[in-house]
């Protein structure tokens, strides 16, 4: 592309162009480095296309394999309707997905385009299940219409999910939503040992709110849904004990326990799914992002109802069922994740990175607090929104590091699973300098 191609100007005539001021060079960008076509500058990518790129950009096992690129082109030449007409490419993807990411207790799968529609279909699964479960018990089949969810949750921007998302009024204001029961998230402030009493009290309040919702809406709660770690809402961690207690409440009250792993899934926390580290046994799991397409896995109590959505034709469906080209790409990415043992690598790299991030934070006590992480899903807080936004700008414009905000005052890290400690060290040095520029009295950067 020539430098006078005016990509942003041409786009701005028709769409809102308020993203990064970078024109992505699809040829020179690679791994954890993004190159701007217009300036030639390289940026350290610690956002990975909103946590959707498991191996970074242009992974060699994809772009460096002519045979695979020909296969990908073959799959992309047409866009068949996967739910209706089948291909070996589709079957190959499902086999690899089940092997690398599957849970034997969740054998049912459904694929769709995007995370919001993944959650949407998880909710439809729960509504259908609760209605039929009520009917089996002699209760009203018209009930089973409500979802318990958390404050600061982000589950998407589609029809049902708008009633759950509550991170930023810009995303939900003026759109009609359901008044479903919303309970306070008992988010951990780290270090946990210094805040345990407050966190336990918050958990007790939240559980009391959930119990009240079940009492006030008998037979009408279809499910509880949560992100194992709230992402956009502030990288909010919850203790396993709280989520396990919510799981017990769901079982005691005949509601499904649903997890939204759209951002936490596919290794970011050090296991295929975050719930595997938290002692949880979900009935439905929604996924997207790093999978390259959206979908749900389901099982456990879903099968207590024989005619659930996975048994009755067309109860849930979509035209393309996820997209064949995305499935072919996903299969190769998952094969590399498996071959290279990236889940274990993320565990070790993430533990090292969190320790280093805590060390940086300790040098800026007036600016940095609540350093937290699981695997490579790490974050920290600034005193307020203004400081957070200023730091993000300094990192991008002066240090050439791409990071994301979350919540009202947090910075979150979303690197590729393949990022090296050397690249993370580059990011930490840049962060140290940026914090020093932002102005912490008495703090001296170590690098």
Kindly label every feature range from the protein language model.
Residues 1-447:
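Conserved N-terminal phosphate-binding loop of PLP-dependent enzymes in the Aspartate aminotransferase
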